[in-house]
From Swiss-Prot:
Region of interest called Disordered, as start-end residue ranges on this chain: 245-267
Keywords: Cell membrane, Membrane, Transmembrane, Transmembrane helix
Top-level taxonomic group: Eukaryota
Keyword tRNA processing on entry: no
Protein name according to UniProt: Transmembrane protein 268
Length: 342
């Protein structure tokens, strides 16, 4: 099975390799030609693994060799645990399967059938006209509601996903200085759920400088808006709590025999609200913003879902926004629509 090389969003055709899909396979490609210049938004390589295999792991060693062929020295040890712990936990893998396009399509079909049956049976119960009128009413209503549901699904896919995109914050933070961004997508091939980890080249220094200046300007003139937007960049995390075992005050009150062991209790946990972009110097906040939304930007880039722009700052294509434009407009902007899909 071949991995189709997608069109390079950055304007230059990056060699996307072919592979046989397995539980731990990296597509192998030919090294780029000598002197070939990398462009912002250029796909470097893609890791593809079968999500139905257990256990699975990314072949990041082979990815390291592929990046070295492009002249990028990134030791896999710097981000191996960050990427695998973020994406390969069982609950995350199940979420990717249930959130896949075929599952959404199946849900829409079931929703259509249930709505149609309920509306038709209701129309017959109250004898609203003849049989064909009931069929037409049920069909139009079910189609309209199902189309609305599909549009809601599609709109959610254009938002940053806290269960996939934002889990790559730590990995992208480690790769920013190497001019590499990670993003994750999923697809279904046959009966296999496939996780795709994308490596995209992007020199973010200009974006860091612009966002740093923009954050500094917002601190001076729009501090309330900045605080409001950053307050939405938080996730709920569970942390373990060590229970405090209190012994008897008097040793004479202690039982001579140990108590009967009961069923194993669940570990105690507490939920904490973690701020993804805490208050700091403008440059540090700019780098953190790029790390937080790097996975989101990469997913939109490789799936051609980035919003169209009339001009770009740091991309070769005039109609593709760069990361700082996306963050400026859709994260720090004055829009009322939420940008996170919980």
């Amino acid at each position: 099975m071949a991995c189709e090389p997608p069109t390079d969003p950055g304007g230059a055709a990056g060699p996307l390799p072919t592979s046989t899909l397995g539980c731990n396979i990296l597509p192998q490609g030919n090294p780029p030609g000598w002197g070939q210049e990398l462009h912002n938004g250029q796909v470097l390589t893609v890791l593809r693994i079968d999500n139905t295999c257990a256990p699975i792991s990314f072949d990041l060693g082979a990815a390291e060799e592929q990046l070295q062929a492009w002249g990028i020295q990134v030791p896999a040890e710097q981000y191996r645990n960050l990427a695998e712990s973020a994406l390969l936990e069982p609950q995350v893998r199940r979420y990717i399967i249930y959130n896949s396009r075929p599952m959404r399509l199946a849900f829409a079909v079931v929703f259509y059938v249930l709505v149609w049956a309920n509306i038709y049976s209701t129309s017959q119960m109250f004898a609203l006209g003849n049989q064909w009128a009931g069929v037409l009413l049920a069909t139009l209503a079910a189609f309209s509601l199902t189309l609305t549901l599909v549009l809601v699904f599609e709109r959610q896919q254009r938002k940053a996903n806290t269960n996939t995109d934002l889990r790559l914050v730590a990995a992208n933070g480690a790769l920013l200085r190497h001019r590499v961004l990670l993003g994750v997508t999923d697809t279904v091939e046959g009966c296999q759920s496939v996780i795709q980890l994308w490596f995209v080249y992007f020199d973010l220094e200009n974006c860091v400088q612009f966002l740093s200046d923009h954050v500094q300007e917002m601190k001076r003139s729009q501090e309330s808006l900045l605080r409001s937007r950053l307050s939405q960049l938080c996730v709920v995390m569970e942390t373990g709590v060590s229970p405090v075992v209190e012994g008897p005050e008097d040793l004479e009150d202690a039982p001579l025999l140990p108590s009967t062991p009961g069923p194993q209790e669940r570990p105690l946990t507490q939920t904490e609200l973690y701020q993804l972009v805490p208050e700091a110097e403008p440059e540090e906040m700019a780098r953190q913003l790029l790390a937080v939304f790097g996975g989101y930007y990469t997913r939109l880039l490789v799936t051609s879902r980035l919003p169209q722009s009339m001009g770009t700052r740091h991309m070769d294509s005039a109609r593709i926004p760069c990361p700082c434009q996306l963050i400026e407009v859709h994260v720090l902007g004055t829009g009322c629509c939420p940008f996170l899909a919980r």
